[in-house]
């Protein structure tokens, strides 16, 4: 179990979002991109947020440009894109790294709690596996975030209970969240 007060996330206005303020809530943390094949997941994320926020869910959007540069633009441009195209209302943080030496401390912790377990089955999972093998033949053996729209779900007690790869069915993500509320 982590202590929420141990982690903060930089916001676009230069302040930090202290996770302690979400004590007792279910949190979904997701690294996002505006120019990715998975970007339409914003629609599902916003629907989950709309349906579950009043029951105790928070979604934290962390834009990331580490995967083929699919999050170009400033924080302001990213925010404008998300709010105009997908009507997102959940908090969006400053564009940040999720892997490597500049990764947010929170992501280092999350990956340690829920390492990569595969993309599942289906055409998207197969395509992701083929692509990543070209980049790193040993991609399966490290806990790093593999692509945009990887989601971590944290229960009300602060336990990291799930990691969903971008290929996961959003119904499974919703079911997990609703089961914790």
Language-model region placement:
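A short beta-strand-turn-helix
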Residues: 7-26, 47-52
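Conserved helix-turn-beta segment immediately C-terminal to the redox Cys motif
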Residues: 25-26, 34-63, 82-86
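Thiol/selenol-based redox catalytic cores and closely related redox-interacting motifs
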Residues: 81, 87-167
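Non-catalytic, surface beta->alpha helical segment in thiol-disulfide oxidoreductase systems
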Residues: 161-181
């Amino acid at each position: 179990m982590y202590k929420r007060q141990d982690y903060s996330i930089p916001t676009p206005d230069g302040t930090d979002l202290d996770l302690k303020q979400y004590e007792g809530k279910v949190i979904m943390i997701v690294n996002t991109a505006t120019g990715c094949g998975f970007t339409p997941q914003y629609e599902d994320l916003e629907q989950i947020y709309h349906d579950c926020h009043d029951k105790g869910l928070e979604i934290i959007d962390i834009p990331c440009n580490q995967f083929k540069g699919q999050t170009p633009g400033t924080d302001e441009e990213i925010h404008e894109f998300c709010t105009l195209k997908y009507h997102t209302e959940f908090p969006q943080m400053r564009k940040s790294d999720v892997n490597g030496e500049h990764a947010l401390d929170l992501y280092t912790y999350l990956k340690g709690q829920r390492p990569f377990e595969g993309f599942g089955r289906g055409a998207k999972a197969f395509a992701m596996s083929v692509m990543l093998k070209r980049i790193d033949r040993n991609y399966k053996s490290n806990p790093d975030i593999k692509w945009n729209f990887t989601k971590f779900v944290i229960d009300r007690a602060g336990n990291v209970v799930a990691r969903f790869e971008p290929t996961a069915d959003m119904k499974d993500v919703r079911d997990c969240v609703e089961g914790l509320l």
